[in-house]
Amino acid sequence: MFTWRCLILWAVLVTATLSAARPAPTLPDQALPKANIEVESHSAHPGDLLQLRCRLRDDVQSINWVRDGVQLPENNRTRITGEEVEVRDAVPEDSGLYACMTNSPSGSETTYFSVNVSDALPSAEDDDDEDDSSSEEKEADNTKPNQAVAPYWTYPEKMEKKLHAVPAAKTVKFKCPSGGTPNPTLRWLKNGKEFKPDHRIGGYKVRYATWSIIMDSVVPSDKGNYTCIVENKYGSINHTYQLDVVERSPHRPILQAGLPANKTVALGSNVEFVCKVYSDPQPHIQWLKHIEVNGSKIGPDNLPYVQILKTAGVNTTDKEMEVLHLRNVSFEDAGEYTCLAGNSIGISHHSAWLTVLEATEQSPAMMTSPLYLEIIIYCTGAFLISCMVVTVIIYKMKSTTKKTDFNSQLAVHKLAKSIPLRRQVTVSADSSSSMNSGVMLVRPSRLSSSGTPMLAGVSEYELPEDPRWELPRDRLILGKPLGEGCFGQVVLAEAIGLDKDKPNRVTKVAVKMLKSDATEKDLSDLISEMEMMKMIGKHKNIINLLGACTQDGPLYVIVEYASKGNLREYLQARRPPGMEYCYNPTRIPEEQLSFKDLVSCAYQVARGMEYLASKKCIHRDLAARNVLVTEDNVMKIADFGLARDIHHIDYYKKTTNGRLPVKWMAPEALFDRIYTHQSDVWSFGVLLWEIFTLGGSPYPGVPVEELFKLLKEGHRMDKPSNCTNELYMMMRDCWHAVPSQRPTFKQLVEDLDRIVAMTSNQEYLDLSVPLDQYSPGFPATRSSTCSSGEDSVFSHDPLPDEPCLPRCPPHSHGALKRH
């Protein structure tokens, strides 16, 4: 039996044979050129293998290779084999104009090769620089080989655009292509001052061979005037570019008005629908056709029944997805078609109608047209290929073992994975619905008439099995609940055989699952979190994914178990007995913490955040409550894979444990909803404050409205009594108003590592004195006293010169410290 590849190959060969049956067009002899001149450009880097090949006629008699008009010699690096030249371990001196000259009875022919061996390192940003080393420039440079020449611009037309406005995170390149004798030097200024790589985070690259400067991942602080100065001993020239970095404005996809357009075609015609999508975050595009199910176009939940005609694959480009092709349409193809595009912000859609009319009879003139034979040939080939495709589809449909309730099986794109559903699907037509998990939300049609959105039967969803992570349900023993939210819960469990090399080993784990009243959005978020944890990988200081149960039952996500709870409760439980505001002043703390222990906590969290940042993961909710502690006192960051709707944050709503999330948010996240690694650094600074107050609440007693005002005016929290000046300055650096001026997590890890190494294990905290400037360990119920001047966390007292360990800090008196 032929494979489908063989069948398609056979159809193509038949088509080619039919095409070859036509007489080939011929040109008169006088149309043949007597001599052809060709120029090819070749670029290479030092050490590359350079290969030049000359195309020859059959009757060629002699071949001669020259470089810059001089016979090309053969040596230990250069080998000439007739029509081919090979240069091993290329060097910049191998650059030049190569020529292959051939003679034959039919005439002579010369092919030119412009070769540039650049001394710059290979870079993806230099793809547009090939013209800088063209033969024209070399000829210009060679016109005055021994004369003194002041610097000059070689391509001034490429420097006409002076203002460059780009979105944040883009790569910017400024070029000043120049010439001169002797070869001039290049240096760059920013806003009239010397510009060094350490003047910006990430530095910059200079390509001296292409007279350019390259800055990756630009941020607003990169705005300014950039001046290139090209000079030698005979003169100096300069040129200034202006850079404006525009902050990204996240929004759901924008679809071009009027597209797709309505179509009216004859039976058997081909139809093309076009949908133009504009989106800053990567969009996911699907084409849908509205269908009827049991005589109805609308389901019991008032959403239309649709069939997914086209969805993005692994290698599908957005341009390909913007066009829907329908071949040989029938009356059944008539109806409403929808282009639906979504990104991490939301979804948008436009619809169009297809009307199919009876085909008109062909006129006799059409049958006698000179193109008739060609049409028959291509139609025959298309028919054969269509037959092969249909055969393959039928074969695959018969080979599948899954049963469907309707004629087709549809799929949902879920983080580059398909989640097949067992029933006909419906897609929400609400353009403003959230897609924070980055997936299309698809729901199964209900067999009953109930319109409830709840997942009464989560098992209706069939997730694809991932052998790397799948754990049989009979090897998971569920235990007591550890915690729960509105629609999800976490339980303690024992997993058998997580380690493939130790199939009988029992491991304590935590299992995330949905409650019975969870919605499809909750299921989508849980799947998204699981897939995110798979992609991020494992690290000692994050909660790692251990496995999952996705088959034959509800979804279980198996993660590491942290026996000592979250960091905030861990710190509060270890407050000294005499310390005010501890949960139970009469009980003995579980263990006494040293100053080094607290710095170690901060160091471990910074390491985890450094790893997440390296994986391009932005946490958005870093706080002590989202850091878990294992039995061995290892800090593990949790909830980094959660899908969060940042556009619907209730700034005045407390979390389940009474904390206000806004108190950990950076100003740009709070006011403009801009979340970056730098906004996570701000949250880390607040977490540092929590650590050195042993679980204190930030800004106690400060109303949200007042907090907004204080942050805008530059006020910051005062130094905790049990931290050094160096650590407090680290907090203040994290709270810098300009995001680009905050330290990176890499820098924080290095600084904290140094502090840990220099700190003695015996420096225990003297926390027996009241810390009345910090909040109690329970939800804020002291609003009347916390807002008083005696309880303010702000101060304008100058920083002490000596470390504040161990000593009793003076009470502040309501004054404010300005950043």
Curated annotation (Swiss-Prot):
UniProt KW keywords: ATP-binding, Cell membrane, Cytoplasm, Cytoplasmic vesicle, Disulfide bond, Glycoprotein, Immunoglobulin domain, Kinase, Membrane, Nucleotide-binding, Nucleus, Phosphoprotein, Receptor, Repeat, Signal, Transferase, Transmembrane, Transmembrane helix, Tyrosine-protein kinase, Ubl conjugation
Family recorded in the similarity comment: Belongs to the protein kinase superfamily. Tyr protein kinase family. Fibroblast growth factor receptor subfamily.
One cellular component term from this protein's GO annotations in UniProt: cytoplasmic vesicle
Name the record gives this protein: Fibroblast growth factor receptor 1
Gene for this chain: FGFR1
SUPFAM superfamilies with a match to the protein in the record: Immunoglobulin, Protein kinase-like (PK-like)
Membrane topology: Single-pass type I membrane protein
Glycosylation site list: 76, 116, 225, 238, 262, 294, 315, 328
One GO term of the biological process aspect: positive regulation of MAPK cascade
Keyword Coiled coil belongs to the record: no
Domain remarks in the Swiss-Prot or TrEMBL record: The second and third Ig-like domains directly interact with fibroblast growth factors (FGF) and heparan sulfate proteoglycans. Isoforms lacking the first Ig-like domain have higher affinity for fibroblast growth factors (FGF) and heparan sulfate proteoglycans than isoforms with all three Ig-like domains.
Ig-like C2-type domain boundaries: 25-118, 145-244, 253-355
Disulfide feature: 54-100, 176-228, 275-339
Annotated positions of the Phosphotyrosine modification: 461, 581, 583, 651-652, 728, 764
Biased composition (Acidic residues): 124-134
Stretches assigned to the Extracellular side: 22-374
Species of provenance: Gallus gallus (Chicken)
PANTHER family per UniProt: FIBROBLAST GROWTH FACTOR RECEPTOR 1 (PTHR24416:SF131), TYROSINE-PROTEIN KINASE RECEPTOR (PTHR24416)
Pfam families named in the record: I-set, ig, PK_Tyr_Ser-Thr
Substrates-to-products reaction catalysed: L-tyrosyl-[protein] + ATP = O-phospho-L-tyrosyl-[protein] + ADP + H(+)
